[in-house]
């Protein structure tokens, strides 16, 4: 597999590797995904050296969406370069916004995460290259360029699978549980039964084993993609910054939504929330002893020579955007104003999670992507679910998020430990808890680790099973 084309010289080849940052974002043509790209541009330009290059690789499901995304991110970079007082002050009177724009590159490729054959082909093209932007661009056209590595991959793409809102129930829940709780953990969304991708002719899957649409779009497609991208994510030595896999989860990934006997959520009332619970469990337990027999296989490249040459595995992190006014939520456009108002009011009265707009919601994955590795290691950041959070004054921070059965950091914390939290105001751990939340116990954490081991085994079994079904690996 792989292309035989000779790679062209890329614009970022003019600087050393430490002055390059390669970030792939799935589902990046709108919403949170597009905002992650925008926020990366802002924070990268504000914090990195004036020689450094940012290479954004937003994925979409069509060439037309890729062209729109490239244009949107280029326009955003141009505006940022022209209006940034911080950049002008860093450079001085010799500042030219054109020089700044020339350090931001957008290469958009297409992948449908429900099309597993397409996922394998996408990863193969990116790993072996070269790759190109779709035809039809003005300005910089990246053609036949090679991606030497990936520094960060953000798993943002998702599919909700909702049919609408039960409005009488919504009114009742708001009246009985209060506005903040009811718009943070809404129990009135109506989910469609998750579709079997096997029944969709365009994917050409066999009738069995079943493959759930929501589960594959949210979890399994990303899981397969991550493994296939290991040649770009693994490193040769500890002196190199490891690659980062960043999952985008949800506040709604609560314990009761996942039934391990219905792992793909075919029978549950909330397949999206169930898939996000699986995401939480996988990410938080990836390095725990019980999960290692399966997770070590996942983090090892298939090519033995590649595995020997690059033994340093990528790190896995967990984030969520808080609550934003997204088209993913099943509200008709003519009711969206009311939904946005409810989110605003919730933030005004003290909720840390109602960020309202997608740019604010993009804070946590961008923060993970741009932090020094030593800072993340000191925080033991792989054991924490990092949420995008804001207060009524629109101060935006990352906030540790409670996970049912795990707590905030995978350890028991008594009142004294929680009182020692140095965060201020709504950014403190205990602000914004779900009503009825109980403090985690040692027994809970043991059970969570067991769920992790079972989930990792399930995912690895699925990955190998579908590799064999599709025949995508060389003998």
From Swiss-Prot:
Compartment(s) of residence: Endoplasmic reticulum membrane; Lipid droplet
Membrane-spanning parts: none
Pathway(s) of this molecule: Steroid metabolism; ergosterol biosynthesis
One Gene Ontology cellular component: lipid droplet
Superkingdom, natural source: Eukaryota
Enzyme Commission (EC) number: 1.1.1.-
Range of residues in the leader sequence: none
Keywords, comma-separated and alphabetical: Endoplasmic reticulum, Lipid biosynthesis, Lipid droplet, Lipid metabolism, Membrane, NADP, Oxidoreductase, Steroid biosynthesis
InterPro entries reported in the protein's UniProt record: Ergosterol_Biosynth_ERG27, NAD(P)-bd_dom_sf
Signals that turn on the gene: Expression is significantly higher when CYP51A is deleted or in the CYP51B/CYP51C double deletant.
Topology relative to the membrane: Peripheral membrane protein
Tagged with keyword Transferase: no
Main location as per UniProt: endoplasmic reticulum
UniProt binding sites for NADP(+): 32, 55, 59, 65, 272, 276, 324, 326
Catalytic residues in the record: 249 (proton donor), 272 (proton donor), 276 (lowers pka of active site tyr)
Any one GO MF annotation of this record: 3-beta-hydroxysteroid 3-dehydrogenase (NADP+) activity
Top-rank EC class of the record's enzyme: oxidoreductase
GO biological process: ergosterol biosynthetic process
Miscellaneous section: In Fusarium, the biosynthesis pathway of the sterol precursors leading to the prevalent sterol ergosterol differs from yeast. The ringsystem of lanosterol in S.cerevisiae is firstly demethylised in three enzymatic steps leading to the intermediate zymosterol and secondly a methyl group is added to zymosterol by the sterol 24-C-methyltransferase to form fecosterol. In Fusarium, lanosterol is firstly transmethylated by the sterol 24-C-methyltransferase leading to the intermediate eburicol and secondly demethylated in three steps to form fecosterol.
Family listed: Belongs to the short-chain dehydrogenases/reductases (SDR) family. ERG27 subfamily.
Cited function: 3-keto-steroid reductase; part of the third module of ergosterol biosynthesis pathway that includes the late steps of the pathway. The third module or late pathway involves the ergosterol synthesis itself through consecutive reactions that mainly occur in the endoplasmic reticulum (ER) membrane.
Assembly: Heterotetramer of ERG25, ERG26, ERG27 and ERG28. ERG28 acts as a scaffold to tether ERG27 and other 4,4-demethylation-related enzymes, forming a demethylation enzyme complex, in the endoplasmic reticulum.
The protein's name: 3-keto-steroid reductase ERG27
Gene symbol of the encoding locus: ERG27
């Amino acid at each position: 597999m792989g292309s035989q084309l000779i790679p062209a010289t890329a614009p970022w080849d003019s600087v050393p590797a430490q002055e390059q940052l390669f970030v792939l974002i799935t589902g990046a043509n709108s919403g949170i995904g597009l905002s992650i790209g925008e926020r990366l541009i802002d924070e990268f330009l504000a914090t990195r050296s004036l020689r450094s290059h940012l290479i954004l690789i937003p994925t979409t499901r069509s060439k037309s969406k890729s062209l729109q995304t490239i244009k949107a991110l280029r326009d955003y970079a141009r505006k940022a370069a022209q209006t940034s007082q911080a950049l002008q002050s860093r450079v001085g009177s010799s500042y030219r916004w054109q020089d700044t724009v020339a350090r931001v590159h957008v290469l958009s490729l297409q992948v449908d995460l429900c099309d597993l054959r397409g996922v394998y082909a996408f990863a193969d093209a990116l790993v072996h290259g070269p790759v190109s932007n779709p035809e039809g661009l003005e300005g910089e056209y990246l053609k036949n360029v090679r991606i030497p590595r990936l520094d960060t991959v953000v798993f943002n793409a998702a599919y909700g699978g909702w049919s609408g809102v039960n409005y009488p129930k919504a009114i009742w829940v708001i009246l009985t549980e209060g506005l903040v709780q009811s718009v943070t953990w809404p129990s009135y969304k109506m989910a469609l039964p998750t579709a079997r991708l096997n029944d969709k002719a365009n994917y050409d899957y066999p009738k069995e084993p079943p493959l759930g649409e929501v589960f594959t779009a949210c979890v399994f497609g990303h899981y397969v993609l991550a493994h296939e991208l290991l040649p770009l994510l693994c490193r040769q030595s500890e002196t190199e910054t490891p690659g980062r896999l960043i999952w985008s989860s949800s506040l709604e990934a609560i314990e009761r939504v996942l039934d391990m006997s219905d792992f793909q959520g075919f029978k549950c009332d909330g397949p999206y929330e169930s898939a996000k619970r699986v995401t939480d469990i996988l990410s938080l337990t990836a390095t725990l002893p019980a999960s290692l027999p399966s997770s070590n296989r996942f983090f090892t490249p298939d090519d033995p020579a590649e595995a020997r040459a690059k033994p340093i595995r990528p790190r896995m992190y967990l984030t969520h955007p808080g609550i934003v006014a997204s088209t993913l939520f099943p509200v008709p456009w003519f009711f969206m104003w009311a939904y946005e108002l409810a989110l605003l009011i919730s933030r005004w009265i003290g909720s840390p999670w109602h960020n309202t707009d997608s740019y604010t919601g993009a804070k946590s994955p961008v923060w993970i992507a741009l932090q020094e590795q030593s800072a993340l290691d000191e925080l033991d950041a792989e054991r924490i679910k990092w949420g995008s959070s804001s207060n009524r004054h629109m101060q935006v921070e990352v906030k540790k998020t409670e996970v049912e059965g795990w707590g905030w950091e995978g350890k028991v914390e008594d009142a004294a430990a929680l009182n020692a939290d140095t965060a201020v105001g709504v950014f403190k751990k205990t602000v914004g808890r779900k009503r009825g939340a109980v403090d985690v116990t040692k027994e809970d954490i043991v059970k969570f680790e067991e769920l992790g081991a079972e989930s990792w085994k399930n995912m690895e079994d699925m990955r190998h099973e579908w590799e064999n079904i599709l025949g995508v690996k060389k003998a």
